């Protein structure tokens, strides 16, 4: 009956599991923006951590073509943590879900999505920088020099 009521009123019914919260982009990049990132790096979790934000200055972008999850643009950032340390973080942008997003050396980048410990030359990474695809995630995004992708989520 509730679905019929929504249909009669012209309201779309979307399962709650597909709707994430919209988290605003900070006005400026400060070490405090990277607080949850720092906590994740200190904790070294084995799995993913939902709703992690990073901001920093891009070192550049490389493209990983193909693979199990499709092509990705990988943006490498230098991010300053609240305790004063600077770390390298990768932002993995899925070309199929997010569209290709890249950053040049020196660009300011913010990203919000699912965090992970990446190893190698990076202290951590952020992916799922797109509209929420599961119920425990907020809507993710990546912002390069003020240009946000995605621009909105349904």
Regions found by a protein language model. Give the residues of each.
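Bacterial N-terminal signal peptides
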Residues: 2-12
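OB-fold and OB-like single-stranded nucleic-acid-recognition modules
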Residues: 18-154
